[in-house]
């Protein structure tokens, strides 16, 4: 391999190195991890799995620790605009240089072991955080839990936010099967915090099988937060319990905890922008459960609403639409330039006959039309790609 210099060169090379984009299993990445960290990672670890709410829960934890003057690293996925978003230290995303240096360190030790794009990302996150000498790291599971690459690290505490039907090709098509996969992040004699209000029995069974400690959180946080939606109070409660579990190592003052929760913010989770006197809501809700939550938040303010929507073909799109259509007066459908996207023609067939739908040639024309419509509110949702496309254009307004 010739010397790779830029981040784009590294990422293009990784995509071709291991052509199977998703290749679940820990054997390959474990080999390289042990070479990089023979004694384990030098920081506290919180691992977060769950169908929805992971990013918001991480935002709460991140903000609490920053407010308390601890150095915190967060590894999240997918990114919205820039790959570097996946690695943050005290809220600042990693530079191209630091990511390339991490990739270089991995490549030096990798040998003949083939790694996927996501496995490279996971190892790079750990290398970056170790180099930055962070106190605590929050790792977001990319898919499932049991066989996801972040599961090479033994967490000091883990969180399962909730269980809903998603990624059925990989995780199974029942909540019990998906719960089993998420429960794979648990460890014996280590606490796992679960926020699901009706948890599948597979989570408790797995905890019993391995001797993990399991705590169910049912009561939402009652304090002030900036993030909108009742579900965010539940996410905040999970974050509080996680930082409380690490109090001996990373002591948090109650006042700093409250301030951290209130300051927490995250892109594209009912993110509200005002453009040309129109309210625009950006939300990465991309499955039935998340869209139901989005609908509940929209219902808090009953105003004429236009949706800009697109989705991936492996989702249950009929249920996604039916979960929110009572809140939407008009739909603008946009194409996505990713392989997994459903075509606009196939997408239209998922709607009821009474829906008012317009196909737009791209996101720019959809936003132009939305900003000149009679509807007071515009909501952009359906996938990370949909929202990312909108954000790139709205940044120019």
Task: State the predicted function of each range.
Residues 1-20:
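Charged, amphipathic alpha-helical linker segments immediately N-terminal to NTP-binding catalytic cores
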Residues 193, 197-215, 279-280, 288, ...:
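C-terminal helical cap/extension that packs against the catalytic core
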Residues 46-48:
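Hydrophobic anchor at the beta1->P-loop junction of P-loop NTPases
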Residues 145-147, 154-211, 318:
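Conserved catalytic-core segment of NTP-binding enzymes
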Residues 365-395:
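A glycine-rich beta-strand to alpha-helix segment
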Residues 9, 20-21, 26, 30-41, ...:
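ATP-dependent carboxylate-amine ligase catalytic core
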Residues 131, 136-141, 149-159, 163-167, ...:
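Nucleotide phosphate-binding/pyrophosphate-handling subdomain across enzymes
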Residues 56-60:
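Hydrophobic positions on the alpha1 helix immediately C-terminal to the Walker A/P-loop
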């Amino acid at each position: 391999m010739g010397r790779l210099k830029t981040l784009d060169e590294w990422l293009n090379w990784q995509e071709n190195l291991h052509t199977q984009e998703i290749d679940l299993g820990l054997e390959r990445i474990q080999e390289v991890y042990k070479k990089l960290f023979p004694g384990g990672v030098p920081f506290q670890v919180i691992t977060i799995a769950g169908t929805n709410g992971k990013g918001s829960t991480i935002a709460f934890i991140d903000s609490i620790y920053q407010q308390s003057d601890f150095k915190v690293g967060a590894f999240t996925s997918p990114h919205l605009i820039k790959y570097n978003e996946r690695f943050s230290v005290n809220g600042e995303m990693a530079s191209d240089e630091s990511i390339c240096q991490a990739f270089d360190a991995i490549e030096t030790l990798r040998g003949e072991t083939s790694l996927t794009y996501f496995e490279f990302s996971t190892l790079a996150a750990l290398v970056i955080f170790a180099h930055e000498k962070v106190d605590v790291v929050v790792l977001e599971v990319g898919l499932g839990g049991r066989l996801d690459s972040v599961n090479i690290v033994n967490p000091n505490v883990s969180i399962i936010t909730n269980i809903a039907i998603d990624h059925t090709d990989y995780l199974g098509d029942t909540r019990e099967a998906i719960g089993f996969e998420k429960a794979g992040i648990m460890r014996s004699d280590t606490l796992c915090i679960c926020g699901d209000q009706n948890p599948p029995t597979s989570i408790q069974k797995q905890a019993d099988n391995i001797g993990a400690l399991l705590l169910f959180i049912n009561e939402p946080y009652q304090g002030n937060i900036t993030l909108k939606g009742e579900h965010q109070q539940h996410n905040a409660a999970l974050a509080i319990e996680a930082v409380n579990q690490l109090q001996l190592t990373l002591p948090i003052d109650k006042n700093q905890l409250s301030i951290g929760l209130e300051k927490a913010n995250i892109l594209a989770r009912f993110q509200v922008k005002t453009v040309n006197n129109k309210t625009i809501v950006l939300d990465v809700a991309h499955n039935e459960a998340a869209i139901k939550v989005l609908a509940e938040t929209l219902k808090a303010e009953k105003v004429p609403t236009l949706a800009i929507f697109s989705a991936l073909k492996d989702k249950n799109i009929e249920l996604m639409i039916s979960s929110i259509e009572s809140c939407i007066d008009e739909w603008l459908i946009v194409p996505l330039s990713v392989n997994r996207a459903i075509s606009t023609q196939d997408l239209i067939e998922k709607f009821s006959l009474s829906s008012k739908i317009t196909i737009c040639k791209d996101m720019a024309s959809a936003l132009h039309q939305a900003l000149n419509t009679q509807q007071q509110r515009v909501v952009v949702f359906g996938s990370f790609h949909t929202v990312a496309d909108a954000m790139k254009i709205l940044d120019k307004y």
